Amino acid sequence: MVKANYIRAGRLVRILRGPRQNRVGVIVDIVDANRVLVENPCEQKMWRHVQNLKNVEPLKFCVSISRNCSTKALKEALESKKVLEKYAATKVRRPHRAKKAFAESTDFERYQLRVAKRSRAYWARKIFDENDKKNPVSWHKVALKKLLKNAKKVDSTPAAKKRVEKARAARKARLAAGKSKTKVAASKK
């Protein structure tokens, strides 16, 4: 379904680029087919200014105002509908808030965040591994369990035991031959 957030007076928009990036404003008036007049009296840097439509993202929230209304009327309309609070609670706003908080944090706060993430990952992994030992859910544990079950069936016959012992003896012989070759090579140097 197509988003029907049409450009009109009263529509909330988010600025995409520039010094006011990720700030929210309200369309006060439409200048022409490419530009609109945007303002947000509740925010300090969002005084009335012209924005290109390529630089704004229309949001689903809208307030009922007349075109080119006063700042006072716009502020009253925003406060009565509480659209800024509704927008702040949306999923779209969450990453912007997190990014802003991270940018404003100090070096030590970022360090604390990294340590907390590591700790959380360690404990989550530890709990998962403990539970995985009791009741395997990870694919490699389940596959290993199946393999061991099938191996027990195959290894129980006397012929299989003989083959396993023969393979072990051959491996030991190879290792011994490899060690003797390295000793000979070392003595030639």
Swiss-Prot record:
Flavoprotein found in the keyword field: no
Protein family per UniProt: Belongs to the eukaryotic ribosomal protein eL14 family.
Alphabetized InterPro entries for the sequence: KOW, Rib_uL2_dom2, Ribosomal_eL14, Ribosomal_eL14_dom, Ribosomal_eL14_KOW, Translation_prot_SH3-like_sf
Cellular component annotations (GO), alphabetically ordered: cytosolic large ribosomal subunit
Role, per record: Component of the large ribosomal subunit. The ribosome is a large ribonucleoprotein complex responsible for the synthesis of proteins in the cell.
The keyword Ribosomal protein is annotated on this UniProt entry: yes
Gene Ontology MF, one: RNA binding
Protein name: Large ribosomal subunit protein eL14
Keyword line: Ribonucleoprotein, Ribosomal protein
Biological processes, Gene Ontology terms: ribosomal large subunit biogenesis; translation
A Pfam family assignment: Ribosomal_L14e
